């Protein structure tokens, strides 16, 4: 029987969308399909190598759909120069609603819509997005932990687990390290850099090592502060993750049993939503600034060996979202 062909089209705002589609592509391949990823090739190759994900065929295609593109109304223009997707059995986009203009039968993946996640989103663009969703009522895959209510309103929703990696899922009783990271970061990156500069002046800390995202690590730093690699070997040493709560970094941190201490920019609705969801699930502290996140993490460090509640919450998480999504999609042809 001929393999089903699947086109995967990524939003270009950060690495999370590409990573999710890489994991989905790997699962689709393992399930007998033939996936092709449409994304920035260099980003896809970097993520696949770092996260040890099997890389599919990649067509170098940048949708130019970052935050600034959405706010100036140019993001929806990507459909005008999109490649021909008519020959694919299945088309998936994470998380571009405009894919429905090209393939009305397309799947969406993600946990939110851009028109709900950004402040000052252009009114006409939001109106067009909602109109597309109402017209086509697309099928959508979302990790249950992060599903927003809007997805339930406008799509045929299939909820799955987190898109985890089996090579990350390894517990250890000898965790002594902390991670500080902010991803693309937005306006919070400057705050994070100032914090790490001040942190580097401390003579003693509670952790053995503090892994810091390279973009925000000071040049003049002590031996205990080292650049974060985001490789499995790093994550397996992490007890606490002081992070801007993007779904990808949250997933990797949780998969090794780390507790999340979030910080994020006050005007980012997506980060607010993610932080609230993981707090309500008992997986994170209720913090907003990086200073508060650090202080809360130190209190956790002093008592984590007695914190059976956190271990119990971690044990209940489903990390098989990519495999579940692949089977759902292939069974709906």
Name the predicted role of every residue range:
Residues 3-12, 30-73, 288:
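Conserved nucleotide-sugar phosphate-binding/catalytic loop shared by glycosyltransferases and other
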Residues 7-13, 20, 110-114, 120, ...:
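Active-site donor-nucleotide binding/catalytic segment of nucleotide-sugar enzymes
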